[in-house]
């Protein structure tokens, strides 16, 4: 079922919040839906047919080859000042074919939307792709982050908010255990006669302890993001969570 969602993006150093109202279907049957993108001007730009562009294309070729089999890869190409660092991550429950399909869409889209930027990121429901001229591996990305939520309100926001935070906190612990190499977890929680479904995930360049800090940070943004909303997400360049009142992901 199509539902009205709202995206709230917080760019670094922004004075005003940019709010975009969109109609979109973010259901289990549309895993490859485009979510958002950002092209960074901070790191400057490159020219067509330059060494930086060549290194960027090589990076994307490597990610396209490496990621589908494992769901994640991070790589660097070239030497300073034309080196490019990048990663790609597929949702933890995505099949290899779904992962590949998402990357085949996301990478050309990112190149088209950020044609000459030395840094950029794109999010789809099933994957994210990110590149930069600076080495960001192992660090929490505080710059790239946005909210997405259902505009419908729940009948008992106080209880719902508390149970949502409890579920996401529980999933964070599950995702950051020593044996969870995917840094990914899903689960469900009963709220009266209804069920709440949740997902958390980090990019795998982070250590478990850093992943936990990233997830705890965005879970702390629940009141600003999704207070009393039937569904919501905080999506960043290093970690994300999502919750819904319908089963958007397998939990077993």
From Swiss-Prot:
Impact noted for substituting residue 191 to L: In strain: cv. Bla-1 and cv. Bu-0
Subcellular location: Secreted
Annotated GO CC locations: cytosol; extracellular region; plant-type vacuole; secretory vesicle
Main localization, broad class: secreted
Superkingdom of origin organism: Eukaryota
Entry annotated with the keyword Nucleotide-binding: no
UniProt cross-references to CDD domains, sorted A to Z: Gnk2-like
UniProt entry keywords in alphabetical sequence: Repeat, Secreted, Signal
A UniProt-annotated Pfam family: Stress-antifung
Protein name as catalogued: Cysteine-rich repeat secretory protein 38
